[in-house]
Structure formats: C-alpha cells, structure tokens
C-alpha cells in the first residue's frame, strides 16, 4: 500500500472568512476498506485517492459529526420528503462519469454561487474523475436519483465496516419541490439500517458556516473529540 503524506501552506479558510486554514493530506494508492474506515473515524475525508483533514493553527471549528443510525427516527417532515419522492428512481452503483454528471454538477454549483455566494470552479472530466470516481475500490458508490428518466441528484458515499461516509451530494435546483438533498441523506440512513451499520459520517460540522451548520439538525449525533493518529487505540466520540 503506497502512502504519501503532505500538507498545504496556510490559506484563506473556505468556510469562515476571518480564519486561515491548513490541510494535511494522505495519498493512498490502493486503500483497503478497513484503513479507510479507521481514517474516517479519526476525522479524515476521502476524495479520490486522497484523504484530508484540517490542521489549522488556533482554530478547531471543523468538527467531525456522525449520525447514530440505530437511534434515528424519521420526523413527520422527513416522512413527507420520502412520500414526495415515491416515484423517484434510486440506483445504488459504483461511481460513474458522464456528460449528465458534469452538467448536473455545474448547474448545482452555478445555483449555489448565486444563492450562497459559493466560489465556483469549472470542473473537467479528468478533475471530476480524480475527485469522485478514482479510488472507489470495494467501498465507493453513488446513489443516482432519476425523475422521469432525468438524472436529478448524485450522492457519493463510501460503505464502510461500521457506517456510511457521506462524501458529496449535488442535485438539480429546478426540482427543489422534492428536497433532493434531504432525500439523499434519508436514503443513506435507510441503507445503513438495512445493512446493520451504526453510523452516517457526515464530515465537518461548522457552526458559523451556513452550508455546514445544518448537519447538527440530524439527531441523535456524535462529535469527534480531539484527533488521533491511525491505529492509536482510543477514539472518543461524544453526543
């Protein structure tokens, strides 16, 4: 297993305008599922063959959050979202790349640029492949959502030994009635329940960042306390 570690220089934080960020990376050529799981449990995130975590000086606003699947019950509003999507076709498959994917990705980010002032980058086929397809091994999947044979949402996930790691989701803003972002996460929870998995790893919760603060609404959940290196025994998550 080839592994290369490196860090970025300090840069503007993408989540908080008054903060600076620094990121630690691991490039892992062919990452086994169990190593992926151990890294995710310790606050890392996977994109392609790269794993990353923040190592920012004097800041700990990025908190790893996971949903407790076995204790999670759908609310009335969440059941309404599921009912609205009764005719939405959901396919679980290995990560894919097509013109449809890239068009939907671009449409979603143009919308978010206008709505939430996200910084948008044009993504090529190669860049998308490197971020969301490469390195899927025996754990990477996408949930593809279709309404009337139109691809309207893609949710990229890793199915690990103790849970599902939610990597990235994008959807067609023209179908806002269907609450596709919420519906995709509810599908993750349903899949985890069927597979007897304990957690949905949602990535980073940042209280002062609107795009990430919503994650705390999914309860019960736990927050990772501190950081641990790979194979250090005790990893502490607290409600």
Curated annotation (Swiss-Prot):
Pfam family, one: ATE_C
Cell compartments where the protein resides: Cytoplasm
GO cellular component: cytoplasm
Keyword annotations: Acyltransferase, Cytoplasm, Transferase
SUPFAM superfamilies assigned: Acyl-CoA N-acyltransferases (Nat)
Stated family: Belongs to the R-transferase family. Bpt subfamily.
The name this protein goes by in its record: Aspartate/glutamate leucyltransferase
Provenance organism: Campylobacter jejuni subsp. jejuni serotype O:2 (strain ATCC 700819 / NCTC 11168)
Gene: bpt
């Amino acid at each position: 297993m080839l592994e290369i570690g490196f860090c970025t220089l300090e840069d503007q934080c993408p989540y908080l305008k008054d903060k600076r960020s620094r990121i630690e990376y691991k490039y892992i050529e062919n990452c086994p599922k169990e190593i992926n799981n151990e890294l995710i449990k310790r606050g890392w995130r996977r994109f392609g063959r790269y794993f990353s975590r923040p190592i920012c000086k004097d800041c700990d606003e990025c908190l790893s959050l996971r949903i407790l699947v076995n204790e999670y019950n759908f609310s009335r509003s969440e059941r309404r979202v599921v009912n609205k999507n009764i005719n939405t076709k959901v396919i679980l498959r290995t990560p894919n790349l097509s013109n449809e994917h890239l068009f939907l990705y671009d449409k979603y980010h143009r919308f978010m640029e206008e709505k939430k002032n996200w910084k948008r980058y044009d993504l090529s086929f190669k860049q998308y492949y490197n971020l969301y397809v490469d390195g899927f091994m025996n754990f990477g999947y996408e949930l593809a959502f279709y309404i009337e044979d139109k691809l309207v949402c893609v949710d990229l996930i890793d199915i690990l030994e103790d849970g599902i790691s939610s990597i990235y989701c994008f959807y067609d803003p023209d179908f806002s009635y269907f609450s596709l972002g919420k519906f995709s996460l509810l599908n993750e929870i349903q899949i985890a329940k069927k597979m007897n998995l304990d957690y949905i790893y949602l990535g980073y919760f940042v209280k002062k960042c609107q795009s990430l603060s919503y994650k705390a609404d999914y309860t019960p959940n736990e927050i990772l306390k501190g950081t641990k290196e790979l194979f250090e025994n005790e990893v502490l998550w607290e409600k």
